[in-house]
Every structure is written in structure tokens, then in C-alpha cells.
Amino acid sequence: MATWANLGLQNSSSPLMEQLNFFHDHTVLILIMITVMITYVMGMLFFNKFTNRYLLHGQTIEIIWTILPAIILMFIAFPSLRLLYLLDEINSPLITLKAIGHQWYWSYEYSNFMNLEFDSYMIPTNELDLNGFRLLDVDNRIILPLNNQIRILVTATDVLHSWTVPSLGVKIDATPGRLNQTNFLINQSGLFFGQCSEICGANHSFMPIVIESIPMNYFIKWVSSQLN
């Protein structure tokens, strides 16, 4: 989850987020190399006494500054395209979860089970436990099994919303009249927090998302208790 004064990305809890972190570091490394090189070249230009008689016409340097950026962009584009395909790939999901955005709460339906659905509201600050997280805890958490492919279908009933859990690398728009989908796999047990990431009205900041990841045997017991 997000912590105070954290300048980096959240710790990854899914393979997709690990790949996103790697791509971020890869891109930042390239940007640092470009910045250092440009700073060095600009410094050399300003602090030397040489003159160039061919300043107005330099075909060689024009070829270099055309080809070199193209090569650099290829090193960024290919990993980016690979990630885009991974984010859209659906790999035989074990469970399908449907999230429906409302002003200003979420509804969830487990499509694999009959009559397993609930609404999820933020717990007000005056009703929060001492160990609760302000503006992040909900009355009904999403319970999902560990180390299994999960497909999520997202839509909305009124205005645009966005279902987002940063530590899982998931962000998908909830659009009225349209069903969007993505998949993810949680490789760590625990609680994962997110929020609506599309401004949707006065209480937009009061639409938290909480996922509780548990082993499969505990998930089966939870499903049985809910259905009974």
C-alpha cells in the first residue's frame, strides 16, 4: 500500500507489476544516460575556445542526431509493446470477478458462484477501528485466492470510474454501458489497497478498494460460508 513520504512505486505483488517496475527502471536508466550525455556535450560547447568553420552545414552530425534517437526509441518501444500485450492477455482464469462502479461505492459479483455478490462502502472515520486505515478500509473486502489467474470485468452504472490497485499493476476504466476486462495473479498473501482513479463527483476520494489474498483452502471455506 502507499506509505508516507514514499517517492518510489509500491512493492509489486503480482508478476505484471514486477514487469512494470522493471520497465520503469529500464526507461529511467536510458533517460539518465541521455541527460548525462547532453549535459556533457553542452558543457564542452560552452567551455572551450574552438571554432567550427562548417557550423551552418554538417551532414554527418545531422545523420547522427536522426539515427541515434531512433535507436534509443526502439530500446524503449519494444519492451513497452511486450508489456501492452501481457496486460491484455487473458490466461485461462480460475475465477471471474465483476466490479460495478457507483456514485460512490463499488459492487462485486463472483460470476463462478450463484448469489455471491455484495456492495463495498468506505468505513467512515468515526466508525474506524484503531488499527484501520483512514479513507482506505471498507466494510466488505474482496476475497481472492493466492497464485491463481483472476479475470476482472469492470463497468459502471452512472459515470466514469476507474478500478485501480497499484501494487498489483491493475488500472481499468469503468464505463457505463461497456464491459472492460483484464487479468492478474496475486503472488503474495495480504491486504492490497486501491482507490477509484477517475474523478467521478463530490465523493470521488471515498471509493476505496481492498483485496484480501488468501490460500485456496481458506478461499473455499469463505465461499462456502457466504453461500450458506
From Swiss-Prot:
Its cofactor is Cu cation. It holds the Pfam family COX2. Its EC number is 7.1.1.9. Keywords: Copper, Electron transport, Magnesium, Membrane, Metal-binding, Mitochondrion, Mitochondrion inner membrane, Respiratory chain, Translocase, Transmembrane, Transmembrane helix, Transport. GO terms for cellular component: mitochondrial inner membrane. It catalyses: 4 Fe(II)-[cytochrome c] + O2 + 8 H(+)(in) = 4 Fe(III)-[cytochrome c] + 2 H2O + 4 H(+)(out). Gene3D superfamilies: 1.10.287.90, Cupredoxins - blue copper proteins. Cu cation A1 binds at H161, C196, C200, M207. Component of the cytochrome c oxidase (complex IV, CIV), a multisubunit enzyme composed of a catalytic core of 3 subunits and several supernumerary subunits. The complex exists as a monomer or a dimer and forms supercomplexes (SCs) in the inner mitochondrial membrane with ubiquinol-cytochrome c oxidoreductase (cytochrome b-c1 complex, complex III, CIII). Belongs to the cytochrome c oxidase subunit 2 family. This is Cytochrome c oxidase subunit 2. It comes from Culex quinquefasciatus (Southern house mosquito).
